[in-house]
Structures are given as C-alpha cells and as structure tokens.
C-alpha cells in the first residue's frame, strides 16, 4: 500500500503494538476463549502487515484460512470442552515446565541477538519473480505459484509452520 511515510510508520507502530498485546494475551489469559480471541487479533494484525507490504493475496489467504477457519475451529473446540479440568492443575509446576521455559527463553534470546547483529541491508535476493518468466505468458495460478516461491517464500513457510502447529495441537487435544 503506497502511503505517506508518517502514516505508514503510525500504522506499523499500531499494528506492532496490537501484535505484541495479542501475543501476550494468548499466553497470559487463563480463560481459553480470551486466548483464542487474542490469537484472532494476532492473525488479523499479521494479515494487515501483509497488506502494508503490498502482498494482498497472502493477506487474503491469511484472513480466510487462519482467522476464518483455524481460529473459529479453536474457539468451537474450546467452547465444547469441559473447562474445569484445566483450572484444577493450573498452579502445578513440573520439571518439564521448567525445562521447556528455559529452552524457550534461551531460543528467544538467541533470536534477539541474531536479529540485532545481522546486517539486513546486505541481504540480496538472487532471483526475482520478474526474472523467471514473462508475466504476460503465464496464467494467474502460475503467477501466484511464482510469487509464493520467490517473493513471498518466507511468509508462506511461516504460515505453513503455524498451520502445522495448529494441526498438531488439535490432534493432541483430540487424543486427550
């Protein structure tokens, strides 16, 4: 989206704060319904980030697939479950929880140091979608495939990982 600089920056700050607050809400709310709605806020903010970066198809796919399907499925699953069994064991802290917290915290700090130490301006994409093939000679589906495999490769892979985690979580909840 071609916006003037200050408006674009204000929208980035607003969406970033919504993303951080939604992520904190997913983790910190004890009520699973509120956590699911916070996840919906996070997914909507991510799709709005895609709109700001001019990738409208990825934004539409994010809204339709994740907000429209996965988050609604999570909300229905949480609403049909018996909530009392989760509140009884809420304050128990096991060794596995401590090890998991330690591993996740170390991964977080290593990611923060890697991101801050990397020179992002030196990264050059080797292949652009306009260098592969003439755009007039291919269909829309082929253009989407080319864009997903070149320009939007990283967001596409991250969305795939989020979907995989959602499926594993749904299977784990169904087995209990």
Curated annotation (Swiss-Prot):
Disulfide bonds: none annotated. It is found in: Plastid, Chloroplast thylakoid membrane. It comes from the Eukaryota. It is a multi-pass membrane protein. Pfam families: Oxidored_q3. Its EC number is 7.1.1.-. GO terms for cellular component: chloroplast thylakoid membrane. Gene3D superfamilies: NADH-ubiquinone/plastoquinone oxidoreductase chain 6, subunit NuoJ. It catalyses: a plastoquinone + NADH + (n+1) H(+)(in) = a plastoquinol + NAD(+) + n H(+)(out); a plastoquinone + NADPH + (n+1) H(+)(in) = a plastoquinol + NADP(+) + n H(+)(out). It comes from Drimys granadensis. NDH shuttles electrons from NAD(P)H:plastoquinone, via FMN and iron-sulfur (Fe-S) centers, to quinones in the photosynthetic chain and possibly in a chloroplast respiratory chain. The immediate electron acceptor for the enzyme in this species is believed to be plastoquinone. Couples the redox reaction to proton translocation, and thus conserves the redox energy in a proton gradient. This is NAD(P)H-quinone oxidoreductase subunit 6, chloroplastic.
